[in-house]
Swiss-Prot record:
UniProt-listed SUPFAM superfamilies: Ribonuclease PH domain 2-like, Ribosomal protein S5 domain 2-like
Enzyme Commission number(s) of this protein: 2.7.7.56
Pfam hit, one: RNase_PH
Top-level EC class: transferase
Protein name per the record: Ribonuclease PH
A single GO molecular function term of this UniProt record: tRNA binding
Role, per record: Phosphorolytic 3'-5' exoribonuclease that plays an important role in tRNA 3'-end maturation. Removes nucleotide residues following the 3'-CCA terminus of tRNAs; can also add nucleotides to the ends of RNA molecules by using nucleoside diphosphates as substrates, but this may not be physiologically important. Probably plays a role in initiation of 16S rRNA degradation (leading to ribosome degradation) during starvation.
Highest taxon above the source species: Bacteria
GO biological process: rRNA catabolic process; rRNA processing; tRNA processing
Highest classification ranks of the organism: Bacteria, Pseudomonadati, Pseudomonadota, Alphaproteobacteria, Hyphomicrobiales
């Protein structure tokens, strides 16, 4: 039995609320159970120096946690003077994932910066961030369309992410913190709406896992991502 009493293939309650920040071109408040992330997408008329003059745009991401997003206060990284390796890894993952969803040439020489701020953490902050970031990005692109800033379609695919793991010998979907901290194996899957794989991160915490177990986790992830994509489509409709 899972601590949350969910079925092995059951997501936590998920909500995706678009347009929650009035100043941002795109925004989304995403909730995976008790994990809550505020995502904004900002359109900027600038590019990394190495991209200038190439006729295409860029998507980049930043990620951070509020000090009391966790049980005990975590010092702000700004006050520490540097980002942790975990933060850098996650924001690069978010940026990579979103770039697969976009026709960068159709975007033109512009940059969209996606900021993911974790308000409350209960496992799966990176997967919630990616899923909500796609909604914020779509919201930003819709904003651009209403101002005739785009000549062709920019969004190529939905992108969502979910965690899976082996908990008490059973493959389960969408781990919360209680499960993640005790799981024998945990993995994060980033996929497109049609089931193509963007990135997989998997680690055996206690016991190595078999190919069959990995395939079971991937099957759960496909099911979870399909449901998340349905919710994304409803959020941006």
């Amino acid at each position: 039995m899972r601590p949350s009493r969910r079925a092995p293939d059951e997501l936590r309650p998920v909500s995706l609320e678009r347009g929650v920040v009035k100043y941002a071109e795109g925004s989304c408040l995403v909730k995976f159970g008790d994990t809550h992330v505020l995502v904004t997408a900002t359109l900027e008329d600038r590019l990394p120096p190495w991209l200038k003059g190439q006729g295409r745009g860029w998507i980049t991401a930043e990620y951070g946690m509020l000090p009391r997003a966790t049980l005990e206060r975590t010092r702000r990284e700004a006050s520490a003077g540097k980002q942790t390796g975990r933060t850098v890894e996650i924001q690069r993952l978010i940026g990579r994932s979103l770039r697969t969803a976009i026709d960068l040439e159709a975007l033109g020489e512009r940059q969209i910066t996606v900021d993911c701020d974790v308000l409350q953490a209960d496992g799966g902050t990176r997967t919630a961030s990616i899923t909500g970031a796609w909604v914020a990005l779509a919201d930003c692109i819709k904003w651009m369309k209403t101002r005739n800033m785009l000549k062709t379609e920019v969004l190529r695919a939905n992108v969502a992410a979910i965690s899976c793991g082996i908990y008490n010998g059973t493959p389960v979907l969408d781990l919360d913190y209680a499960e993640d901290s005790e799981a024998e194996t945990d993995a994060n899957f980033v996929m497109t709406g049609d089931g193509r794989i963007i990135e997989v991160q998997g680690t055996a915490e206690k016991t190595p896992f078999t190919e069959a177990e990995f395939l079971a986790l991937m099957a759960l992830a496909r099911k979870g991502v399909a449901r998340l994509v349905d919710l994304q489509k409803m959020a941006v409709a």
